[in-house]
Design a protein with these regions (language model features):
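Enzymes and membrane/adaptor proteins characterized by extended Gly/Ser/Thr/Asp/Glu-rich
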Residues: 66-103
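Acyltransferase
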Residues: 21-26, 53, 243-244, 268-294
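A short helix-breaking turn/cap at a secondary-structure junction
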Residues: 188-274
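An N-terminal boundary/leader segment
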Residues: 1-50, 285-287
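Immediate post-signal peptide segment of exported/extracytoplasmic ligand-binding proteins
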Residues: 55-71, 218, 248-257
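Short, well-ordered beta-strand elements within core beta-sheets of diverse protein domains
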Residues: 9-16, 91-95, 207-214
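Residue-level signal for inorganic ion chemistry
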Residues: 28, 48, 100, 219, ...
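Short glycine/serine-rich loop segments
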Residues: 100-101, 105-226
Length: 300
């Protein structure tokens, strides 16, 4: 079976009966077991295969859910009923969730398959994924480099192709930074957009659960499913959830800003600055409007 980087491509082949969902899950479990980057703490073999068989039954009668067959892994601070969750700390060793996070319930409801839990910095406090009771995570792009953190396992797993989408949590960069380190896409939703129910908290007034994937389309689709008001989280927004997967991606209408003080900072590595400027030119050539903005309080 080939490695998929797009859920749309995977779903097309699944719907064409080129393989079963159970075969797909077994393919990913085997690939996870062969990995040496330590991104996975545990695979949920029994429940994942059970979910896959249910999806296969539904597909046999042409019942399609929005995320049927999407292979998802979750950071080890997100609860999934009956499964282990430790926030990568020995303090919680052996603990099993007594309920599922709202994001997990919504994913499963729409046909996603939760294949396992992912390594992170202990209690999500870190930026290199070296502070875990399960040991450090290696960056699949370069095993001698860190994957970033605290959602390092979430970013590394997607980068290596061990799952199509992962969930991480972000307080001050813990989705965005490891996604950048591992060459994938990570999104921290606006606070209150996604329910925090079932997330082991780090800083409750900043924490947000968000997706990591290989492309914007998969990010949009998952965000569409996990967003929305939740009676179990009083801080969740009651605003209507946009149809993110149908948003207009017309480049000429998109404006991108970057902070000039960051790119001109004396502490910035010259190679990073050069590549950043090349990316700005690339975006401009693609039709985006890219402009600098000032943030003079950066040093404080």
């Amino acid at each position: 079976m080939k490695l998929f980087r797009s859920f749309k491509n995977l779903q097309n082949e699944l719907y064409s009966s080129n393989f079963t969902c159970e075969e797909l899950v077994n393919f990913y479990i085997k690939k996870i077991n062969q990995s040496t980057n330590n991104s996975f703490i545990e695979t949920f073999n029994d429940s994942a295969i059970s979910q896959a068989r249910l999806i296969d039954q539904e597909l046999s009668v042409k019942k399609h859910r929005k995320l049927s067959g999407l292979i998802v892994a979750i950071k080890d601070n997100i609860c999934y009923e009956g499964h282990g969750v430790t926030a990568s700390s020995s303090i919680l060793d052996g603990f099993k969730s007594v309920y599922s996070a709202t994001v997990v319930s919504r994913l499963v409801e729409h046909g996603a398959i939760i294949i396992g839990r992912l390594n992170c910095d202990e209690f999500a406090m870190g930026s290199s994924n070296e502070k875990s009771t399960y040991g450090p995570v290696k960056n699949p792009v370069d095993p001698n480099k860190v994957p970033g953190g605290s959602s390092g396992g979430s970013a590394a797993a997607v980068s290596e192709g061990l799952c199509l989408v992962s969930l991480g949590s972000d307080t001050g960069g813990s989705i965005r930074q490891p996604a950048a380190f591992c060459g994938v896409i990570g999104l921290k939703p606006t606070y209150s957009r996604v329910s925090r129910y079932g997330l082991i908290a780090y800083a409750s007034s900043f924490d947000q659960i968000g997706p990591i994937a290989n492309n914007i389309e998969d990010i949009a689709l998952v965000l569409e499913v996990i967003s929305g008001k939740d009676r179990n989280d009083s801080t969740s927004s009651s605003l209507e959830v946009p149809n993110y997967s149908k948003l207009n991606f017309n480049k000429s209408s998109k404006k991108i800003a970057y902070i000039s003080e960051c790119i001109n900072h004396k502490g910035l590595d010259p190679e990073i600055k050069q590549n950043f400027l090349l990316k700005i030119n690339e975006l401009k050539n693609q039709g985006f409007l890219v402009e600098p903005i000032s943030f003079p309080l950066l040093d404080y």
